[in-house]
A protein has these predicted regions:
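Noncatalytic linker/hinge segments flanking ATPase motor cores
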Residues: 13-20, 41-45, 76-81, 136-139, ...
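General N-terminal targeting signals
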Residues: 52-53, 97, 121-122, 127, ...
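Short, surface-exposed, polar/charged, turn-prone segments marking secondary-structure boundaries
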Residues: 63-66, 80, 126, 138-139, ...
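Acyl-donor binding region in acyl/amide transferases
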Residues: 111-167
Length: 202
């Protein structure tokens, strides 16, 4: 299932939560000056470079071949840089970035469609993971989103614990469908159906 957050709730975010966030934020600041910023129009090329730096130090850079990274040159960086050159798509993009002593340390990247925000990617530098930089940035990003008129955030599926901590609840079910042409392709698909099911990717 997907996870969604209704930003129109009167009791979100709770004051107690924001007060609790001050403790890890204080310790995070021990690593250097914190700069929380929101990416503006015309800043995407530099922003994607900053996101790529974070991804390079994150688990996806350390424990995988990096091909699934969203913003690196060896990942999907070319796609997003190309998309940002389209003024309509660029106008839908939204992002928040945390730098510590000038070094990119966490980011959140989303697409806005009317009053709904769709989360695309987020990551953080594991060197400061114990102080929850990603969660702290997420709260700031969500508060900023509500102020900008966003009413609902859709995080998609996966990582339910993190999303529920931020206040998300289960949303619509997500299903992947593979459509094939009638005839030979359909017959071949039927033959491979059992192998596909056994792979656990249903």
């Amino acid at each position: 299932n997907s996870f969604v957050l209704d930003l129109t709730q009167d009791d979100w975010p709770r004051g107690s939560t924001l007060r609790k966030n001050r403790f890890p934020e204080k310790h995070l600041a021990e690593h250097g000056v914190l700069d929380w910023r929101f990416v503006g129009a015309g800043e995407w090329e530099l922003a994607f470079d900053a996101f790529a730096q974070v991804e390079g130090r994150s688990w996806i850079g350390a424990k995988t071949d990096g091909r699934d990274a969203k913003f690196t040159r060896t990942g999907h960086g070319r796609f997003w840089r190309g998309a940002a050159r389209d003024p309509i798509l660029a106008g839908m993009m939204s992002a928040a970035l945390l730098t510590i002593k000038g070094v990119p340390s966490a980011f959140s990247f989303d697409l806005d469609c009317g009053p709904t925000r769709y989360a695309i990617a987020n990551s953080y530098d594991p060197a400061v993971a114990r102080h929850s930089p990603g969660k702290l940035l997420a709260y700031r990003n969500l508060v900023h989103a509500r102020g900008a008129g966003i009413r609902m955030v859709d995080w998609g599926a996966g990582d339910s614990g993190y999303k529920q901590t931020l206040g998300a609840v289960q949303g619509p079910a997500l299903r992947d469908w593979l459509l094939v042409r009638p005839g030979v392709p359909a017959a071949l698909a039927r033959l491979l159906k059992g192998r596909w099911a056994a792979s656990g990717q249903e």
